[in-house]
């Protein structure tokens, strides 16, 4: 149930034995698993010839259930670190992905720890949506026997900071569960907070269950070992063509230095959008990925932006500063280590205090206006509008660490081999007549030369996977750059010779300017690989048409596909498109399935739990 699979060579079981064991215990509750561990321990330690004497059975060890609700991998990595801490403290722990958690068993939990990230406008991570819905439904049980702790991960640049963590924390308490620790709300730079919290959790749980923490041996429940399968691959692992798992040396903190091989604009010259097709050569690195995964891209800020900021603050750039204990010139820190293109309300608040600018100070009292200002005004433009004389250390203290951007992978390695493709919408806008661009998208489109080095890593996404059965129909809904993973899906389905039907819904402003990968889709249709394609061009007529309108228009046939077992995939904008699409799906289910709104919502939740409704939204 964890996403951390140990090397097969370390296990005393063959893969076949491990698979049989997992099949046998797959439906066991944490309490049953704990009892089983004691049962096996007794079998191993029974002395030959000893006569069993009647005795009162020792109470089963209390298992800590650790739920990871991750969107971009941070919550998962933190949960894995905490699991390792708890095991080192000789506590019984069961780490489970929120999407795999059988939440109807939650009333049986005694010790529950949740690590939850937030996406979009306060939404839970995609894998945690079903659990979130259940807890906020009438079916949620009382949890008076449960003690819990919550760590929330978020981003202060968003209005609903750490909202998912807040939701889980408040709802668990409302259902009668007792807090082990106060909830933590962590920003992008969460590592120090997380380390302190992990130590507190271990100490608190050791005090709660002292008998286990002093046990002479460490037992690891079988549910913590998952055989390598397509849906349970650890973040640093990949599946080879032979089905075995290899551990990659590359990660977010240790990226691969690859080379840019292709950078091509795929929108027309008159398009309002600038979309680039990017191909990156992985060389002989052995870096592996699957359709549905994301590519993490580290980037440098625009040198011109760095120079502009230094000039505004009357700084030279050679001032010594420290970043994570590493000494370097200020200019280098601004170029490669600090975020310059994304502002936050917290940064505005701090800068207002330092600059004593009356306009900014007044803005702090108007929360909606403050949020809008932070969203639309990069740091350098805030400094231009409200000049100050920050020194180098004050500047570094204000800015957040630079973080990589994630892009849905637009290729299948079964076809492209040692390449990875992404589809990048370049962010461009003007502030006071000055052209600005996104940090990573501007780097990829404007500054990175072909054959230039680029640091990348794979962010595995086991919540966005093609069905295991190649005969299963697939419905893909991806307007704009949301089409990227479906290009990977179609490449994979074609290479596999999958016989299942494929249906694509795609939309963009104009047919002539914005039909991304048009020739490829036309070929798939001509060769029968793509069964159906429905296109929505929002600006080609007076009345705007979006993919959700096409879904509603095809409601009867959509329901037929769902009844045939189709898997539904949605990729793209989380705040508007994904919500509108979900509402249409609910309407289609209600109308053609003869259900009321509550039944339709439950039906869609069941599809989500069965991995038949998956979303990659941002």
UniProtKB/Swiss-Prot annotation:
Q: Which reaction does it catalyse?
A: hydrogen sulfide + 3 NADP(+) + 3 H2O = sulfite + 3 NADPH + 4 H(+)
Q: What is its EC number?
A: 1.8.1.2
Question: What GO molecular-function term can you cite, just one?
Answer: FMN binding
User: How does the cofactor attach, per the note?
Assistant: Binds 1 FAD per subunit. Binds 1 FMN per subunit.
What positions does the entry give for FAD binding?
341, 375, 405-408, 423-425, 429, 438-441, 618
Binding residues for FMN: 70-75, 117-120, 153-162
**Top-level EC class:** oxidoreductase
Residues at which NADP(+) binds: 538-539, 544-548, 580
Q: Name one GO cellular component term.
A: cytosol
Task: Please provide the record's keywords in A-Z order.
Answer: Amino-acid biosynthesis, Cysteine biosynthesis, Electron transport, FAD, Flavoprotein, FMN, NADP, Oxidoreductase, Transport
Q: Which cofactor does it need?
A: FAD; FMN
Superkingdom of origin: Bacteria
Q: Which CDD domains match?
A: SiR
| FAD-binding FR-type domain: residues covered | 253-467
Q: Kindly list the biological process annotations in GO that this record carries.
A: cysteine biosynthetic process; hydrogen sulfide biosynthetic process; sulfate assimilation
**Annotated Flavodoxin-like domain residues:** 64-202
Identify the stretch annotated as signal peptide in this record.
none
User: Could you tell me which InterPro entries the record lists for this protein?
Assistant: CysJ (IPR010199), CysJ-like_FAD-binding (IPR003097), CysJ_Proteobact (IPR029758), FAD-bd_FR_type (IPR017927), Flavdoxin-like (IPR001094), Flavodoxin/NO_synth (IPR008254), Flavoprot_Pyr_Nucl_cyt_Rdtase (IPR001709), Flavoprotein-like_sf (IPR029039)
Protein purpose: Component of the sulfite reductase complex that catalyzes the 6-electron reduction of sulfite to sulfide. This is one of several activities required for the biosynthesis of L-cysteine from sulfate. The flavoprotein component catalyzes the electron flow from NADPH -> FAD -> FMN to the hemoprotein component.
Instruction: Please give the family membership noted in the entry.
Output: Belongs to the NADPH-dependent sulphite reductase flavoprotein subunit CysJ family. In the N-terminal section; belongs to the flavodoxin family.
Q: How does it assemble?
A: Alpha(8)-beta(8). The alpha component is a flavoprotein, the beta component is a hemoprotein.
Q: What is this protein called?
A: Sulfite reductase [NADPH] flavoprotein alpha-component
Natural source organism:
Yersinia pseudotuberculosis serotype I (strain IP32953)
């Amino acid at each position: 149930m964890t996403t951390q699979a140990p090397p097969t060579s370390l296990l005393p079981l063959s893969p076949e034995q491990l698979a049989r064991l997992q099949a046998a215990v797959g439906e066991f509750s944490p309490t049953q698993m704990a009892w089983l561990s004691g049962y096996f321990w007794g079998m191993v330690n029974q002395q030959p010839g000893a006569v069993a004497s009647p005795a009162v059975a020792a109470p089963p060890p209390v298992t800590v259930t650790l739920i990871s609700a991750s969107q971009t991998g941070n919550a998962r990595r933190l949960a894995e670190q905490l699991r390792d801490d708890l095991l080192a403290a000789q506590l019984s722990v069961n780490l489970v992905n929120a999407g795999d958690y059988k939440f109807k068993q939650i009333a049986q939990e005694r010790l529950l720890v949740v690590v939850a990230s937030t996406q979009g406008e306060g939404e839970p991570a995609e894998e945690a949506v079903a659990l979130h819905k259940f807890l906020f439904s009438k079916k949620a049980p009382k949890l008076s026997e449960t003690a819990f702790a919550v760590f929330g991960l978020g981003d202060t640049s968003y209005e609903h900071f750490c909202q998912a963590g807040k939701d889980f924390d408040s709802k668990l308490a409302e259902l009668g569960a007792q807090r082990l620790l106060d909830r933590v709300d962590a920003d992008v730079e969460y590592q120090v907070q997380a380390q302190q919290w992990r130590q507190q959790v271990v100490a608190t749980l050791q005090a709660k269950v002292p008998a286990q923490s002093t046990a002479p041996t460490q037992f690891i429940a079988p549910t913590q070992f998952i055989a390598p399968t397509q849906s349970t691959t650890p973040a640093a692992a990949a599946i080879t063509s032979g089905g075995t798992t290899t551990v990659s040396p590359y990660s977010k903190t240790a990226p691969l230095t690859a080379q840019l091989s292709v950078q091509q604009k795929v929108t027309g010259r008159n398009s309002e959008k600038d979309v680039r097709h990017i191909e990156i050569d992985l060389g002989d690195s052995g870096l592996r990925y699957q359709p549905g995964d994301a590519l993490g891209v580290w980037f440098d800020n625009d040198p011109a932006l760095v120079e502009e900021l230094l000039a505004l603050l009357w700084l030279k750039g050679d001032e010594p500063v420290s970043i994570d204990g590493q000494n370097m010139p200020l200019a280098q820190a601004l170029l490669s280590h600090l975020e310059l293109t994304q502002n936050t309300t917290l940064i505005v608040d701090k800068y207002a205090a330092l600059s004593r600018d009356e306009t900014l100070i007044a803005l702090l009292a108007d929360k909606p206006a403050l949020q809008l200002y932070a969203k639309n005004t990069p740091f350098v433009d805030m400094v231009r509008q409200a000049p100050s004389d920050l020194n180098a250390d004050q500047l570094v203290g204000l800015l957040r660490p630079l973080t990589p951007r994630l892009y849905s992978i637009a290729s299948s390695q079964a076809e492209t081999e040692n390449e990875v493709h992404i589809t990048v919408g370049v962010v461009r806008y003007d502030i006071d007549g000055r052209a600005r661009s996104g940090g990573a998208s501007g780097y990829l489109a404007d500054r990175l030369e072909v054959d230039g080095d680029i640091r990348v890593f794979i962010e595995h996404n086991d919540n966005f996977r093609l069905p295991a059965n190649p005969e299963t129909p697939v419905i893909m809904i991806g307007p704009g750059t949301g089409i990227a993973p479906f290009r990977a899906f179609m490449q994979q389905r074609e290479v596999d010779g999958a016989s299942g039907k494929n249906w694509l819904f795609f939309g963009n402003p104009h047919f002539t300017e914005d039909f991304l990968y048009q020739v490829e889709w036309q070929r798939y249709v001509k060769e029968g690989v793509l069964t159906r394609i429905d296109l929505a061009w929002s600006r080609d007529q007076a009345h705007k048409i979006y993919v959700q309108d096409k879904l509603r228009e095809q409601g009867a046939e959509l329901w037929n596909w769902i009844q045939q077992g189709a898997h539904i995939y949605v990729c793209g904008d989380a705040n508007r498109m994904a919500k509108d699409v979900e509402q249409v799906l609910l309407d289609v289910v209600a109308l053609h399935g003869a259900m009321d709104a509550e039944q339709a919502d439950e039906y869609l939740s069941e599809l989500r739990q069965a991995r038949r409704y998956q979303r990659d939204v941002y």
